[in-house]
Amino acid sequence: MSRVAKNPVKLPSGVEVKFAGQQLSVKGAKGTLELNVHSSVEVTEESGELRFVARNGDQQARAMAGTTRALVNNMVQGVSQGFERKLQLVGVGYKAQAKGTVLNLALGFSHPVDYELPAGITAETPSQTDILIKGIDKQLVGQVAAEIRDFRPPEPYKGKGVRYADEVVRRKEAKKK
């Protein structure tokens, strides 16, 4: 058995799990998420916990049991608490402003960058240089944050660009004569 899949996923109060064939749906206070469970993984619910077992003992099935457990754990955490990712803009004149489903960015280009947020994702700008991405889908929150960072990744000489709040940018020394 996978070491990850050995640990059951505890269901907090207010979170419902439904099975429909291989379709697993998790419903909570913040929304609903769905997952197609691999055919080699068996999911059972007992006393407020979800358990994941590989149907046959081969390596692929054990790996899929662990992967499914991790994905479902993220779904349960997402619908109950949600996920957020914080970005910082470092540079003169770099600004961000959230307007509904569009994030307006001024990143030193000759034109403003307008990023359309996907469904289920919200962005807040507590200050002009901070962006807070929130949502219930961990993968989608991280993907949106990475796409925004890709507009102007931090450069190694001055550190200017869009970076994650907890990111440490490796700095290089300027060329000497």
UniProtKB/Swiss-Prot annotation:
Sequence intervals crossing the membrane: none
SUPFAM superfamilies: Ribosomal protein L6
Gene Ontology CC: cytosolic large ribosomal subunit
Pfam families, per the entry: Ribosomal_L6 (PF00347)
Keywords assigned by UniProt, alphabetized: Ribonucleoprotein, Ribosomal protein, RNA-binding, rRNA-binding
One GO BP annotation of this record: cytoplasmic translation
Keyword Ribonucleoprotein included in the entry's annotation: yes
Quaternary assembly: Part of the 50S ribosomal subunit.
Family: Belongs to the universal ribosomal protein uL6 family.
HAMAP family registered for this protein in UniProt: Ribosomal_uL6_B
The name this protein goes by in its record: Large ribosomal subunit protein uL6
Naturally occurring in which organism (per UniProt): Pseudomonas putida (strain ATCC 47054 / DSM 6125 / CFBP 8728 / NCIMB 11950 / KT2440)
